[in-house]
């Protein structure tokens, strides 16, 4: 993990772009791991446990590296806000919303995350959204629609297009997630004495405690809401390593050189990677719209990258 994070500090363009998609590639495995963990224990308990465990591990890394994690007074409220909005509420609303939605429809809603990230960056960081950037975002949305219409595993004609509570919850979760990432980027700029690792450690521990408290109120503890301890420990361990420790921290590191809009756009490839895993490992049919969708994604990615480089939001090196 530390080796990957060190590579993130290079920020040479080819390496940085490679790390962005490598991060999405690794993060896409968290869907299967989360499903496995949910089969072994209650969802809120799973979320709280992995957040607290990951936060403790990050604090341990800070102690090992002898880095300061002293919390400046001006950073207290932003970190609490990040913990509640970007970690706790995002995960809780996402879980509740997913219970009433098909995976393809949830995937479609998540496809709007670059637009919400662009809006949050405009409001919080005063980043300008140009027509060229909107064109790149639109190409990404087209690739998403192509993938869902021709490459998804479900018939989208069976979707109900009414806007119900599950849809609203997932839309809110998407917006809160984008807000959380832009808040993290703003916090890292304002509190230079506090590292990304320390910020994530505090946010994960606080969000984990809130999730466990929520679990204690709404889920049955007898003595713990775990049905399969071995599977639970295996799944939680893998989630902590791949999602919380590697992906969260690498994504946060990349925010130093790329906007949350660009990174959110690049993360649209995660469902495409999931389809690749299904074809390679499970023998599922290769989605016919996959290559077409990837082509649009690459074009949109280049448009946004060059526009943000011109605006000064993307840094080639530090």
From Swiss-Prot:
Any Pfam family: EamA
Residues annotated as domain EamA: 25-148, 191-304
Keywords: Cell membrane, Membrane, Repeat, Transmembrane, Transmembrane helix, Transport
TM annotation in the entry: 7-27, 44-64, 76-96, 105-125, 134-154, 163-183, 193-213, 231-251, 262-282, 285-305
GO cellular component terms given for this protein: plasma membrane
Chief location: membrane
InterPro entries given in the database record: AA-Vitamin_Transporters, EamA_dom
Superkingdom per UniProt: Bacteria
Record localization: Cell membrane
PANTHER family, sorted: INNER MEMBRANE TRANSPORTER (PTHR32322), S-ADENOSYLMETHIONINE_S-ADENOSYLHOMOCYSTEINE TRANSPORTER (PTHR32322:SF18)
Function statement: Transports S-adenosylmethionine (SAM) and S-adenosylhomocysteine (SAH). Allows bacteria to acquire SAM from the eukaryotic host cell and to likely remove the toxic by-product SAH.
Protein's recorded name: S-adenosylmethionine/S-adenosylhomocysteine transporter
């Amino acid at each position: 993990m530390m080796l990957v994070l060190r590579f993130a500090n290079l920020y040479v363009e080819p390496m940085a772009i490679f790390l962005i998609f490598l991060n999405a590639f690794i993060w896409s495995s968290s869907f299967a791991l989360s499903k496995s963990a949910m089969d072994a224990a209650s969802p809120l308990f799973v979320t709280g446990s992995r957040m607290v465990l990951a936060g403790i591990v990050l604090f341990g890394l800070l102690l090992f590296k002898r880095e300061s994690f002293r919390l400046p007074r001006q950073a207290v409220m932003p970190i609490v806000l990040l913990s509640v909005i970007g970690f706790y509420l995002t995960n809780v609303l996402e879980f509740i919303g997913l219970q009433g939605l098909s995976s393809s429809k949830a995937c479609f809603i998540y496809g709007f995350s670059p637009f919400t990230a662009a809006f949050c960056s405009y409001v919080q960081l005063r980043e300008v959204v140009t027509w060229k950037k909107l064109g790149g975002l639109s190409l990404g949305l087209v690739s998403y629609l192509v993938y869902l219409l021709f490459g998804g595993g479900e018939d989208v004609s069976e979707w109900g297009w009414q806007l119900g509570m599950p849809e609203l919850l997932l839309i809110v979760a998407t917006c809160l997630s984008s807000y959380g990432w832009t808040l993290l980027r703003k916090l890292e700029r304002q509190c230079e004495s506090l590292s990304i690792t320390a910020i994530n450690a505090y946010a994960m521990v606080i969000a984990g405690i809130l999730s466990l408290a929520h679990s204690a109120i709404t889920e049955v503890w007898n003595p713990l809401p775990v049905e399969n301890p071995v599977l639970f420990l295996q799944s939680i361990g893998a989630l902590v390593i791949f999602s919380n420790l590697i992906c969260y921290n690498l994504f946060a590191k990349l925010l130093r050189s790329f906007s949350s809009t660009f990174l959110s756009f690049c993360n649209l490839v995660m469902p495409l990677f999931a389809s690749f895993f299904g074809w390679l490992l499970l023998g599922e049919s290769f989605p016919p719209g996959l290559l077409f969708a990837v082509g649009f994604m690459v074009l949109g990615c280049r448009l946004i990258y060059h526009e943000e480089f011109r605006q000064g939001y993307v840094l080639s090196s530090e």
